[in-house]
Each structure stands twice: as structure tokens, then as C-alpha cells.
């Protein structure tokens, strides 16, 4: 949810399985969506991709639930680790995510010293890092307005911070094409 849907940690904690819904598009195709009330109490609908729906089905089935949620399903998006239906709080989810990254870093280090830099990078990761990565990857291949709407940004300038590859391409192109001509190769 943090990466595939680009949700904020608060949005993961504050929403339920019943916030997933489907509707038929103008082309007749059924599409799943996730209704989110985000920052500033702004409502948005996030496309629930086929990949997200498949992972949701696997997650629910592994937890003894029917594969797809129903309208009004009160269960939290992230099921509590120790039974019950009470949603996990932000700090608990944050700590859970940090633990996953720490464990991943430990496993990377066990592969040998060649993996130390990657392990150190992963160890610093957080829930927001996953959202930021989602925004960056979406902005590489999608219209910036769609990325803005998916992430729930009020201003496209906020979404622009995720554009790295365009800046890299612009830098490379400028370096190649805009020269004084004084330097010799």
C-alpha cells in the first residue's frame, strides 16, 4: 500500500478494506479503486492496479478472509499483527516498516561486503521513503497530473519534487548540446 498505492502512513492506518470499490469504466471494463481521505481532509480515488488487487487477495486469503473485500468491510487495510480488528497506530506501522528494512539490511550484509552500501541505504528507508519512491517511479512514465492526483497533492509543484529522470535527461542533454567549445575531448 505504501509503494503500490503511494499512500501516506496515516492513510494506511485510517482506512478500511471497505474503502476498496469497483466501478465499470466507459469501455465496459471493471476497475478497482481505493477511496482515500487524505491530508487536509481531501477525498481522492486511487487506481487499485491489477497487481495491487492480486496482492490484496493474497493478503486477505492468507489471513483467512474472502479474497475480495465487500462494501462497508470494517477491517483495517493493515491487519493487526496480534488478532482483532483494531487498526494499528502510525507509530506501530512506522516501527513495523523500519523493522522490515533493518531485517532486509541484515540479510544483505550476510551476502558479503559487496552489499554493504545497499544494506546501509535500505536501513535508512522508511514508510515515507516508499511513498516518495512510488512518486518518483510514477513520474518517470506517467503524466504529472495523474501522479499528483494519485498522491493527493493540492499543487503540482509538490509533485514536481519526484521528477528526477527528467532533470537527469535535461542535464545530460544540456551538457552535450550547450557548450562554449573551448574544451578539447
Region annotations inferred by a language model:
Residues 1, 37, 89, 119, ...:
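Residue-level marker of regulatory loop/turn positions in helix-turn-helix DNA-binding domains and
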Residues 38-58, 73-99:
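C-terminal catalytic core of Y-nucleophile DNA break-rejoin enzymes
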